[in-house]
């Protein structure tokens, strides 16, 4: 699995990027955990609003998980990898969003956590 991660602000730009259908054949918001909102844009707005009361400017931790080119990875394997990564990074229980994209028949995942306690 190829992992790319970054701390970042700009939640609305990230939400727009993750919801782009012109770049992906299929898109699925798989999970929104710990948010009052029921959609990705509003969930990231929540985190941004909370961050305004702190000094934190990079209030999101974004991770993409891409399997090797020919691998067909089931959703459960992505979920297990995300759980292990979350534990290692100390992000257990933090609000998170998981989005799946499929591009040219290949599934990959994005997981975004709030860094604000």
Language model features with spans:
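N-terminal nicking endonuclease/strand-transfer module with a His-rich metal-binding environment
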Residues: 1-117
């Amino acid at each position: 699995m190829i992992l790319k991660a970054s701390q970042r602000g700009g939640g609305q730009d990230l939400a727009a990027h993750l919801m782009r259908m012109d770049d992906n054949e299929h898109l699925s918001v798989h999970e929104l955990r710990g948010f009052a909102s029921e959609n990705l844009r509003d969930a990231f707005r929540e985190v941004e609003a909370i961050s305004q009361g702190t000094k934190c400017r990079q209030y999101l931790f974004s991770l993409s998980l891409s399997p090797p080119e020919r691998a067909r990875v089931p959703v459960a394997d992505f979920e297990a990898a995300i759980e292990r990564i979350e534990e290692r990074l100390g992000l257990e229980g933090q609000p998170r969003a998981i989005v799946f994209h499929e591009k040219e028949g290949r599934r990959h995942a994005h997981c975004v956590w709030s860094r604000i306690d």
